[in-house]
A protein has these predicted regions:
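Long, low-complexity intrinsically disordered regions
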Residues: 1-229
Length: 229
């Protein structure tokens, strides 16, 4: 059996496994609010809309789906692209505090993507500004947003125009997407508009790493460098 040596202590694979499960609150259900649990986990994978409900039910004593649904409906929790630009569920506080930490990662992904190459030669900041206006009118699907933007940039691909917004602007999916027992197309708006507060322009990598360590333990180096890997 392979072992890891840390500060003179030999940890078995089972000990490491138990430590991870304990950090993840998976050794037994505990009494806590869904909001506090989401923050402890530094967000929850939500690419599949109902997966956070299962994750919270697994961890929390007496959890009911309407508790999370209420957090989403009252804008205390939101769904947005974060780690690896996949959809995560986070509290409103963490959305506003963390989103800027991942922007360098999104910028590099955009520059090397086919979507980014399609928009070479135009002012992408103007695309973002126009998209913000459209989303303030009402939340939009990406297909709708792409068609609206193409009216101004008719020689550009609608998907590339819409994905510029996904990569370069903090946006959130709005309910009923993500509500237990309901289904809807992903519909988006500005995080700042939805939450009524600005996204932080400067946040602490160190604080995020410490929270990650509390929830997951020691990660690979690249994982501990959000926005830089």
């Amino acid at each position: 059996m392979s072992r890891t040596r840390t500060s003179g202590t030999v940890l078995s694979q089972r000990a490491l496994n138990r430590a991870l499960l304990a950090r993840q609150h998976l050794l037994g259900r505990r009494k806590a609010s869904a909001e506090k649990e989401i923050e402890h986990l530094v967000g929850m994978q939500a690419q599949v809309p109902n997966s956070p409900y299962v994750g919270l039910w697994t961890r929390l004593e007496g959890f009911q789906p309407n508790e999370l649904a209420e957090l989403i409906n009252t804008r205390r929790a939101v769904r947005l692209g974060l780690m690896r630009n996949t959809i995560h569920l986070v509290t409103a506080r963490d959305c506003l505090a963390q989103r800027s930490l991942y922007q360098p990662l999104f910028d590099r992904a955009w520059q090397t993507s086919s979507f980014g190459r399609n928009l070479v030669g135009i002012d992408v900041s103007a695309v973002i500004a126009q998209a913000t206006v459209f989303m303030k009118e009402r939340p939009r699907t990406f297909s709708e947003l792409g068609r609206l933007l193409q009216q101004r940039w008719p020689d550009r691909d609608t998907t590339a125009l819409a994905y510029a917004v996904r990569y370069l602007l903090p946006i959130v999916q709005v309910p009923p997407r993500g509500i237990w027992g309901k289904s809807a197309q992903p519909t988006w708006t500005s995080a700042e508009f939805w939450l009524g507060r600005p996204v932080a322009t400067k946040s602490s990598h160190d604080k995020l790493v410490l929270r990650y360590l509390a929830a997951f333990g020691r990660p690979p180096l690249a994982t501990s460098r959000p926005g830089r890997d």
